[in-house]
UniProtKB/Swiss-Prot annotation:
Protein keywords: Fimbrium, Signal
Signal peptide: 1-23
Pfam families assigned: Fimbrial
Recorded family membership: Belongs to the fimbrial protein family.
Cellular component aspect of the GO annotation: pilus
Protein name, UniProt field: Probable fimbrial subunit LpfE
Entries under InterPro entries matching the protein: Adhesion_dom_fimbrial, Adhesion_dom_fimbrial_sf, Adhesion_dom_sf, Bact_Fimbrial_Adh_Pro
Protein's UniProt keywords contain Cell wall biogenesis/degradation: no
Length: 176
């Protein structure tokens, strides 16, 4: 009896499957999918993948005025083997400062009310990737290129306090 019930349900299931197959035979007109991609074979190489910028020692005067620059330091990202590359676009990413989101936050546990500001050699500010700024574009002309920047520590809160003022900023470069 169980065998007959299983056999009948198996036949019923096969009938439903067969009906489903017959119902799907008219698929309509065929379509095309076009794929496109640009594959680059070369990008510049960086002289150093990690940079250390020693900002020295600075003194925080009280009362602290917002906008006061405490320390400035030039630094350069050196690119080599750039043949065939015409443009580099640099994005910098790190947590933005809570008092001024156009600047980079310092690591927790140290100085407060101070943020890191980065500008290119023309004075264009490099804003953290998640903020309202745009990446900075650099023209590449030749085998090597130097991307000149200036870092500065800036007071962003009148209640600024002293302490270690380290910041880690990740950067990425896109080439064209």
């Amino acid at each position: 009896m169980k065998f007959k019930r299983l056999l009948h349900s198996g036949i019923a299931s096969l009938s439903l499957v067969a009906c489903g197959v017959n119902a799907a035979t008219d698929l309509g007109p065929a379509g095309d999918i076009h794929f496109s991609i640009t594959i680059t074979t070369k990008a510049c190489e960086m002289e150093k993948s990690d940079l250390e910028v020693d900002m020295g020692t600075m003194t925080l005067q009280k009362p602290a005025a917002v906008g006061t620059v405490l320390s400035k330091k030039d630094f350069t990202i050196e690119l080599k083997e750039c043949d065939g590359i015409s443009k580099a676009t640099v994005e910098m990413d790190s947590q933005s400062d809570s008092d001024d989101d156009s600047m980079f936050a310092l690591e927790a546990g140290g100085a407060t009310g101070v943020a890191l500001k980065i500008e290119d050699d023309k004075g264009t500010q490099q804003v953290p990737k998640g903020s309202s700024g745009t990446p900075i574009e650099w023209a590449i002309d030749g085998e090597t290129t130097s991307l000149h920047y200036q870092a500065s520590y800036v007071v962003v809160n009148t209640q600024a306090t002293g302490g270690t003022a380290n910041a880690l900023v990740n950067f990425s470069i896109t080439y064209e």
